[in-house]
Amino acid sequence: GSEMCIRDSCTSMERLLITLILVCTMSNITNAQNPFYGQYHTPHGTVPFDRIETEHYEPAILEGIKLQNAEIEAIIQNPEKADFSNTIEAFEASGELLDKVVAVFGNMLSAETNDDLQELAQKIMPLLSEHSNNITLNEKLFARVKEVYNQKETLQPTQEQKQLLENAYNSFVRHGANLEGEAREEYRRLTNELSKLTLTFSENNLKETNAYQMLLTKKESLAGLPEIIIEAAAETAKSEEKEGWAFTLHAPSYVPFMTYSDNRDLRQKLYMAYNTKCTHDNEFNNIDIVKKIANTRMKIAQLLGYKDYAEYTLKKRMAENSESVYKLLNQLLEAYAPTAQQEYKEIQELAREEQGDDFVVMPWDWSYYSNKLKDKKFNINEEMLRPYFELEQVKKGVFGLAEKLYGITFRKNTEIPVYHKEVEAFEVFDKDGKFLAVLYTDFHPRLGKRAGAWMTSYKDQWIDKKTGENSRPHVSVVMNFTKPTENKPALLTFNEVETFLHEFGHSLHGMFANSTYRSLSGTNVYWDFVELPSQIMENFAIEKDFLNTFARHYQTGEVLPDELIERLVDASNFNIAYACLRQLSFGLLDMAWYTRDTPFEGDVKAYEQEAWKDAQILPVVPEACMSTQFSHIFAGGYAAGYYSYKWAEVLDADAFSLFKQKGIFNQEVADSFRNNILSKGGTEHPMVLYKPVSYTHLTLPTNSRV
């Protein structure tokens, strides 16, 4: 229940780039030095990060655009009648160089960015947006796609071919192919504008986060803080040649400070810094950008014939429409609100015992007093557990879980190039010993890395039609976990252990991918289905049999004691209603921005407070603003999609019941989950995939039963 940024498990930067896919002719430079050209001579053809310089991106992207344009021209000029192979498959296979470069570029913007890269992005993103438009608005190309689509009854396609054809046709229509004249030009203008706005939004967010530090110089200001946090703050200050202790807005610094600091004024100061990000009078202000993004998306949706952006988005989701989303959010609201009120009351009572009867618990008091109450009720807190969650051990535990469930093994390979010295690369092998995937891990905060945690991919899986070769994926998990200090290894909080399991769940979805076509493989699924593989893994975090496989005290080697595990399990539902309401409030805020059918010109903060008022328990802080830093919905793929976490929670709780029933390491259940969900990607409708792993045949708010 900390105020940290919501767990950001955007399954990849591609989502930001889906909307972007090109135009320019200036690049005949076949620069022999450019590592993007030709095959990569690295283990498994991994990205040669050690050879890529900033100046390589632009020429390679321009060249990629040129090549894809030529490939598309060849599809259009083909004298043969349009068919599945010469049109749909040919289009699916186009743009290989471009995809390759954009995957690296997009991922570096999130994980290891700098001013040069950001400046380049301002130039490149509009080009990509324009290229994407040139494809979907290409009338001759669409005519051929439509021709194949209209013969779909006679084609007798396989399930994958059928899905690919549906997706291709829909993708054109959803990106303006049926628009005419003025409307086409307007669509181009709006999408171009949107790509610039979302980019600026996230840059502002990163810069504002990095710009802030609270430097404390008096020892007494540190009252209540655990030693490990004080040490880290001293090292942060020292790294910048400052005296004292520096606290930042990065989660490993911010969250513990809000939880443990006895100094209320300092908690308030740090809270306000975090919760007013991008609202100040400086160049990182996102207030206008929020309005522009919401309004631009609304206009795009209306241009395409929808009432609002949510209707446009949800048409291609399990939820299908706004009504289903509101139905889910409101059901949960009714279920949780009374309990959350009760939780607040208990915390208020505890605070008043200490502070007197007129004390009001404010948002900057919540983590502090809720931690005290948890300690009092369950005799447990994050710091008690931390020594048992040393990062290397946790990694062994998480990899070991995948080995137990799926028989896969992980081998670190230092020959695989990485983009930062803290990143590690692993080869992953299937139970028959065959090479399965490459997995990169990147655990700690850096100035060039955005907040949150996410899984992403450098190369999707697909099967080469000509050779039959199964080209395996390269995926990465990126976190912002507690760093090691001079005299302590990286000791994680329980919350960080859960986050690791969550992102690792996404990575299994990527690594087990087994589809013919790359656009259907891995995490390329309906957005409200994508969180099922990640969230089901979080359930293992409080399973004793799993914790026993790895949780050891980093100094004594002592196993995490049973009674501590029991207290952890007992406490796992502590303040759960408040935490759920918080997620619901973000879902309501998201829907409020994207169910508008008239442009927004009002006050962003007031609108936000109105949108989520039913889910708010704590007193309102008028200066605070979530929207200006809500990257999920303004820069990532979660616009009109934040409810997906809650939607998938219904699914994952149901599917995990099978593990609970048959044993948490049961291989039969694991195999079924792998074969029906993890390896299938987006090759069928999620409801079809989900049926075999369902425990109760639950009913979802759309009324479609599993």
Model region roles, listed by residue range:
Residues 33-226, 231, 246, 659:
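N-terminal helix-rich structural modules
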Residues 7-33:
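Bacterial Sec-dependent N-terminal signal peptides
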Residues 164, 196, 203, 208-232, ...:
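Active-site-proximal, well-structured secondary-structure segments within enzyme catalytic domains
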Residues 484-499:
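Short pre-active-site segment immediately N-terminal to the catalytic Zn-binding motif
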